[in-house]
Amino acid sequence: LPAPAARQAVLDVLIAPLPDPHREVREMAATTLAGVGRCSQRAHILPLSRTFAALAATPLPRRGAPGFDAALERVHAGVLGAAALVAAFPYDVPDWMPALVLDTLAPHSESPAPVSHTVRQCAAEFRRTHQDTWAEDQLRFGERVQEVHDFTLGRSDYFV
């Protein structure tokens, strides 16, 4: 196994293109990160989830305002990174995942494209990969289980 510094350097290289101005580059970086996340040590996941949550929390100015595009790229980078971590554990709900799903991803379901598109894709994939074990997996979300239902199925108040 590579030394911890080398492992961190690899992760840094994978994270660097997430805020790239080109959407395709961001999406491919997230796909690669999901694959590497699947086989990396779990000790690296929590710091990554914090990094992605901070990026996703970037305030978005109004569309057309100075800095909107750069802020949207940062938010999308955070959402892509968070979605990559969720995708890295398709049949498991680790301790860090409920907060990442509900506090980082779900709030962006109505954000401008391409952020909302990424969130909807992640929600659909999460629902697909967890449907067989949902009776057990939902216990990991505790009192917030309704929020994850809203995330994966769409908010019910939208249809009222």
Where would I find each of the regions flagged by the language model?
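Hydrophobic residues within the alpha-helices of tandem HEAT/HEAT-like
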Residues: 1, 18, 32-40, 56, ...
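Core helices of alpha-solenoid repeat scaffolds
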Residues: 3-12, 42-53, 93-102, 138
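Amphipathic, non-transmembrane alpha-helical secondary structure
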Residues: 12, 50-53, 76, 80-83, ...
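Short coil/turn segments at helix-helix junctions and helix-capping linkers
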Residues: 13-27, 36-43, 65-76, 92, ...
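Short amphipathic alpha-helical interaction/hinge segments
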Residues: 41-44, 60, 134
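Acidic, Ser/Thr- and Gly/Pro-rich intrinsically disordered linkers and low-complexity segments
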Residues: 53-74, 120-124
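Eukaryotic acidic, Ser/Thr-rich intrinsically disordered low-complexity regions
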Residues: 116-160
